[in-house]
Amino acid sequence: MKKNFFCLLLAWVCAITSLSALDISRLPRQISSGPQGKHHVQGIAYDEKNDCIYMSFTTTLIKVDLQGRVLGSVQGLTGHLGCMALNPDDGRLYASLEYKHDGIGKGIGTQANDKANGFYVAIFDVDRITRPNMDAAEVMTTVYIREAATDYEAKVTNQGKEVDHRHGCSGIDGLAIAPKWGKKGGRQMLYTAYGVYGDNNRTDNDYQVILCYDISKWKKYEQPLSSQNLHQSGPEKPNRKYFVRTGNTTYGIQNLAYDKHSGHMLAAVYPGKKAEWPNYNLFVIDGTQKPKKSNLHGFDHPTKGWTLSLLPQGEHDAKTNTWGFRFPYGSTGICSLGNGYFYVSHPGKDAQTGQQCTTLYLYKWNGNEWHLVE
């Protein structure tokens, strides 16, 4: 009797695994967005349940099927909508959203924004995105990221001089949903990465900074967002604040993607400009290594933080002991599909209209190299 029970259980598990396995044959090798206006693509996400793709174009979110046909869109965001990820626990789409008045943030959109700076995670009810040109108030709530705002507004001392923005923080951009660091299952956490200003003269901006939040009880913070009156409803602190030493990059992690297949986190960046660093385009953060409480380099005063390790794959710069990849894509969108497959954004401009667009290409990553899937 017990033997029969276990045989049936094994058959059931195998059937479920087979149903959930990635069917690569049905995935298009390319998905084109079509022309989307003056702002370039910032992030992408694949919705396995609804079999569709989401793309952010700075002030617009579009929802397309796998043939690129628009199923719905959210218009009129006057902030900077960036990297995004789908939360498998609640089926909603989470994205970074910035309102600030620096060279990038000032003047996005056509409406006058609140004079304050604000950094948020935008949360979209994707099942309600059913038609083009929807207003964000119909489908989106937001949670304030106080830690990023505090670091953005802070003044610190570096090399004896007062400088703006702790850690070089320019806000938030990269975002991923993944289990607690080092685990492959369990409750989903939200990870959002700082944008980091590209200042070659500072020594305290050579880390990527990643905030980790338990989002299971975020409902109490969620509010609609008025760009003329930015709210500050959000957690006081992150559950953890992680540091990854990569060398300074231009505006920090642009896209962050969790690869469930390997357990690693991929961080796509615009390369930095410090001559003493290798300035890679892509870093892989090792999900098998536990965080370590370490002394942080480059600070005027002794500073400790939870540090994460880079995966020892790709190219290695012996001088700085930095691992990374010279993969030119991913900074405008990368999402894991499973089994080592990814959709990766190749941004461009439409030849006829001159408007911004992107084509998502299907890639296979073997841990060392990226290959287009034919």
Where do the model's predicted regions map?
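Residue-level signature of beta-propeller blades and closely related beta-rich strand-turn architectures
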Residues: 59, 98-101, 127, 149, ...
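Beta-propeller domains
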Residues: 23, 46-77, 235, 290-299
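Residue-level detector of Asp-centered blade-edge/turn motifs that repeat once per structural unit
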Residues: 46-49, 86-90, 179-186, 260-262, ...
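Blade-loop segments of beta-propeller domains
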Residues: 67-111
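Repeated scaffold domains used in trafficking and secretory/extracellular systems
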Residues: 38-45, 78-87, 145-155, 167-178, ...
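Beta-strand-rich domains and repeat architectures in extracellular enzymes and scaffolds
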Residues: 29-59, 173, 179-180
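Surface-exposed loop and turn segments in beta-propeller and other repeat-based domains
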Residues: 27-34, 127-172, 215-250, 293-328
